[in-house]
Swiss-Prot record:
The gene is gpmA. This is 2,3-bisphosphoglycerate-dependent phosphoglycerate mutase. Belongs to the phosphoglycerate mutase family. BPG-dependent PGAM subfamily. Keywords: Gluconeogenesis, Glycolysis, Isomerase. The keyword Isomerase applies.
Length: 227
């Protein structure tokens, strides 16, 4: 059994080195090209999908669409879920990473970005960019919508969707594509690879590169590689 992850192509805020999180930004020109190249590469290597899962953020949805279009599979059903959203960066969202490091120190920013269980400063629910004011999440209970997350909380958000939707799809024989975000994919990788809380800090998933997992019947990783 195989599972393919792809982190969205470079976004406009990736290019500007800004914290993005749940803020909805578009792909950059480079990001569009990365997604198209990924789709072509998947086609060249014979990858076909029966179902695709993505987030409710534009950069991941667009990447998913482009990948499927460039691999002649735009007909493949897509399921969009907030549970695959990027980690919510709280008050850091929209801030320049370099300027934030100058203000708080490199080590503090590194911990905010990479630590498994350290939360960023939480965003006020009344902030104009709060997810509580976004109709994408209007169906969710207020106490479920995050104001800031670490990777641990992100995994707790993503895991129910893995167990309820993604894993059963794989086990039923479906060929699955997950087009999501750096941290939601890191959370899933931590779970399926059994990565420790410490080692996950060093895992980086590049934009726009298909990551293939070969899995056994228990969804244990036999092999992983980038195309």
């Amino acid at each position: 059994m195989e599972l393919v992850f792809i982190r969205h192509g470079q976004s406009e805020w990736n290019a500007k080195n800004l914290f993005t999180g749940w803020r909805d930004v578009k792909l950059s020109e480079q990001g569009l090209a990365e997604a198209a190249a990924a789709g072509k590469k998947l086609k060249e290597n014979g990858y076909e999908f029966d179902i695709a899962f993505t987030s409710v953020l534009t950069r991941a949805i667009k990447t998913c669409n482009i990948v499927l279009e460039e691999s002649d599979q735009l007909f493949v059903p897509q399921i969009k879920t907030w549970r695959l959203n990027e980690r919510h960066y709280g008050q850091l969202q929209g801030l320049d990473k370099k300027q934030t490091a100058e203000q708080y120190g490199d080590e503090q920013v590194r911990i905010w970005r990479r630590s498994y269980d350290t939360l960023p400063p939480l965003l006020d629910k009344d902030d104009e960019f709060s997810a509580h004011k976004d109709r994408r999440y209007a169906h969710l209970p207020a106490d479920v919508v995050p104001d800031g997350e670490n990777l641990k909380v992100t995994l707790e958000r993503v895991l129910p969707f893995w167990e309820d939707q993604i894993a059963p799809a794989i086990l039923s024989g479906k060929r699955v594509l997950v087009a999501a975000h750096g941290n939601s994919l890191r959370a899933l990788a931590k779970h399926i690879e059994g990565i420790s809380d410490e080692d996950i800090m060093g895992l980086e998933i590049p934009t726009g590169q298909p990551l293939v997992y070969k899995l056994d019947d228990n969804l244990k990783v036999i092999e992983k590689f980038y195309l």
